[in-house]
Amino acid sequence: MNKKPLEQIKNVTNVTGYRQVSLWKREDLQHPQPDELAEEIPVALVYNGISHVVMMATPKDLEQFAVGFSLSEGIIEHRREIFGMDVVSVCNGLEVQIELSSRRFMGLKARRRALAGRTGCGVCGVEQLNDIGKPVQPLPFTQTFDLANLDHSLAHLNDFQPVGRLTGCTHAAAWVRTTGELAGGFEDVGRHVALDKLLGQRAEIGEDWQHGAALVSSRASYEMVQKAAMCGVEILFAVSAATTLAVEVAERCNLTLVGFCKPGRATVYTHPQRLIAG
């Protein structure tokens, strides 16, 4: 199979995350106009030579995505358990080739064997309903967050969506300091992928999870809550609503879940004791 380094790939627009196209506007169907579309391509995560999952994603920040996915899915517990990564072009997509520690790879293979022997229920690729909820250690209560500082974060979330500003087609995930300042953020066509990129970047730079919160531009699904909790995030802010299962998972793992985050507004679903009204 022909493979080449990511920086040599021509069909992902030098990893800008978007592609220029021609299209037609309603008021003028005779003359095409230039515009931009967000890139969405298959990205396979391959652990020690075995393909584990294929996700549709924006072809940017894929190493951070791989680290975040590995942590939030319980494949690893620490960044140091990944020994190396390469991003290569294959067929019509990309592979992130990840070298895992032997112990973690054995655990991943055991989990795959357990899933392969069951009758599938077809829920989002999970083999049985009981497998939807991953075991998450209850989070500690180590911090407080003044909601008066959230408005600043919301006003600047779009700063981390350059592709979104061009295309109107990406989700964002950013880290909010307790002061309300944003300390890094990522975008992707997939809301889960954007969050994984953020979680991966936090792990890459060795930052702790006890000083701040995650902010996402999307709704809060149970997967988003579970991913955040798996990495030790105590507070998750979402611009849109939360689902019932998200609230149940957040309650069970002691995560403070807040939805409908707009300037001057926030709806707290679980564990408000970490928050200061404002």
UniProtKB/Swiss-Prot annotation:
GO biological process terms, semicolon-separated: Mo-molybdopterin cofactor biosynthetic process
Location (main, coarse): cytoplasm
Active site: 121
Amino acids binding Mo-bis(molybdopterin guanine dinucleotide): 260-265
GO CC term (a single one): cytoplasm
One MF term in the entry's GO annotations: sulfur carrier activity
Record key words, sorted: Cytoplasm, Molybdenum cofactor biosynthesis
Keyword Nucleotidyltransferase included in the entry's annotation: no
Subcellular location: Cytoplasm
SUPFAM superfamilies given in the database record: Cytidine deaminase-like
Taxonomy, superkingdom: Bacteria
Family membership noted in the UniProt record: Belongs to the FdhD family.
Purpose of the protein: Required for formate dehydrogenase (FDH) activity. Acts as a sulfur carrier protein that transfers sulfur from IscS to the molybdenum cofactor prior to its insertion into FDH.
PANTHER family, sorted: FORMATE DEHYDROGENASE, SULFUR CARRIER PROTEIN FDHD
Name this protein carries in UniProt: Sulfur carrier protein FdhD
Organism: Klebsiella pneumoniae (strain 342)
